[in-house]
Amino acid sequence: MLYAVHCVDAKGVDELRSSHLAPHKEYLVGQKHILVVGGALFTEGTDELLGSLYIVNVASREAAEAFSKGDPFTQAGVFGTVTITAMRKSHWNPASA
């Protein structure tokens, strides 16, 4: 099943994010078997990071929660809120990316 994992940064976490970026990226590479797509969210026209959005393909909500909890950004407190929502694949157009 697909789940959207929407992570919003806590306030004032730029340095915290930077210091945990390498392990975060390593973690995502290790999750490529379930990670459909993901990336940082930012304010258009600026470099201001707002959080991250991931689509994961896992068997259960608990597995989506485990994905989120295993992320070094989550463990370090980079994210102020994480919302996990089940979703259906309605349109799939990877060539549009």
PLM regions: where:
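Conserved, structured core segments of small domains
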Residues: 1-97
